[in-house]
Amino acid sequence: MELCCLDLTVQLLPGQIDAGDSVAQNRKLTFTITLTIAPNLPQTLCVRITDADDPQVLLTSCVSAADYPGLKAAQGLLVDFQSFPQHLIQLLQSCQQQHGQLQPRMGVVLSGCGAVPGLLGETAGPPSQSGGVVMQVVEHNSFRRLCHLAMAVAPAATATKLRHLADCLSQLQVCGMCGV
């Protein structure tokens, strides 16, 4: 069951391997949040991040009900797994509402993007060099940047990426037939 699909412009910061490149960029990314409920399996929340301008960008993160207590304890979260998807959606919607303001209070930051081909215009290095990618939902105030949530995200598996590219191609073909 797909819960939410949000288009956000987020600030992308260079990863540790690209520490010499201090240029941050804004990109419009789509966050799709899906809650999988299957009999005899734990519920799983999946976050999928795509870039309409670059179809090779596809990041995913999944948190199961069984994994959530560790995330909750590590980050001091106050909600249970049943409430987590709605709170994540609310945080992302807050970021979306702040977009375009001179000094937005809420934002999404992806760091370690050198591990994702195309995200900062480079190709991925070997796994030993290109550490993980972290999505942070942050709030800025006059004193500091507060991280509400940090989730590890990873480039999607090859089969998932191929399905995504096929969907993108299908959309282009449909738009071409419609004359759009």
What are these regions (language model features)?
Residues 161-180:
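Charged heptad-repeat coiled-coil "rod" segments that mediate homo-/hetero-oligomerization
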Residues 1-166:
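N-terminal, leucine/charged-rich tether regions that mediate assembly and partner docking
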